[in-house]
Amino acid sequence: MPTINQLIRKPRKAVVKRNKVPAMQACPQKRGVCTRVYTTTPKKPNSALRKVARVRLTNGFEVTSYIPGEGHNLQEHSVVMIRGGRVKDLPGVRYHIIRGVLDTQGVKDRRQRRSKYGAKRPK
């Protein structure tokens, strides 16, 4: 532990909190256009083909965002809405595409947690 004199000579440094979703610029959602839609493989213990899209946002940022749910209709030039939220086993994927908004359709035949996947109530 430093002495009072040491603290006077060199004060304590405040820890700088880094922004986890810089492209959002303090907005809850952002609109963008898909520039590339592809699959990628997750980190070590997991194995799958995760669906992701490269999105050019309205503020000029280009980010990689995850497409949640089973099946999607996205292709190049699709207009999408993204939100923050990383995918733990995909390095560099820090955003999610919102299903059921703009050009993104909701997940078909979804019965539980429908609001998260933009699915209408089944009849």
Curated annotation (Swiss-Prot):
Keyword vocabulary terms for this entry: Methylation, Ribonucleoprotein, Ribosomal protein, RNA-binding, rRNA-binding, tRNA-binding
GO BP, one annotated term: translation
UniProt signal peptide: none
Pfam families (alphabetical): Ribosom_S12_S23 (PF00164)
Molecular function GO labels: rRNA binding; structural constituent of ribosome; tRNA binding
Cellular component GO terms held in the UniProt record: small ribosomal subunit
UniProt xrefs under SUPFAM superfamilies: Nucleic acid-binding proteins
Residue ranges of the region described as Disordered: 104-123
Highest rank taxon of the organism: Bacteria
InterPro entries linked to this entry: NA-bd_OB-fold, Ribosomal_uS12, Ribosomal_uS12_bac
Sequence ranges of Basic residues compositional bias: 110-123
3-methylthioaspartic acid carried by residues: 89
Presence of the UniProt keyword Ribosomal protein in the record: yes
Listed NCBIfam families: rpsL_bact
Family to which this protein belongs: Belongs to the universal ribosomal protein uS12 family.
Its biological purpose: With S4 and S5 plays an important role in translational accuracy. Interacts with and stabilizes bases of the 16S rRNA that are involved in tRNA selection in the A site and with the mRNA backbone. Located at the interface of the 30S and 50S subunits, it traverses the body of the 30S subunit contacting proteins on the other side and probably holding the rRNA structure together. The combined cluster of proteins S8, S12 and S17 appears to hold together the shoulder and platform of the 30S subunit.
Subunit structure, interactors included: Part of the 30S ribosomal subunit. Contacts proteins S8 and S17. May interact with IF1 in the 30S initiation complex.
Full protein name: Small ribosomal subunit protein uS12
Source organism (scientific name): Rhodospirillum rubrum (strain ATCC 11170 / ATH 1.1.1 / DSM 467 / LMG 4362 / NCIMB 8255 / S1)
The encoding gene: rpsL
